[in-house]
């Protein structure tokens, strides 16, 4: 049986992550409160952010910026702003 969590991003019970994907206390918080579905949504946003802003994951400041964006997205309900991006459903 799949592990379920009360996902704070989706605001519902959903399948939880299989294991902790992020280190430290934030990783534990994500594991306990974020579903696979919500994590997948974050991964898409994360990829877009890394590409559009040309982030270097070897750079401490870039990693800190990405972590702040992740926390805002997953726990505060703030969408990631990517300059020039228009979601498909809004396009003509």
Swiss-Prot record:
Disulfide bonds: none annotated. The keyword Metal-binding does not apply. One of its GO terms (molecular function) is iron ion binding. Transmembrane segments: none annotated. Pfam families: Iron_traffic. The keyword Iron applies. Could be a mediator in iron transactions between iron acquisition and iron-requiring processes, such as synthesis and/or repair of Fe-S clusters in biosynthetic enzymes. This is Probable Fe(2+)-trafficking protein. The lineage of its organism: Bacteria, Pseudomonadati, Pseudomonadota, Gammaproteobacteria, Alteromonadales.
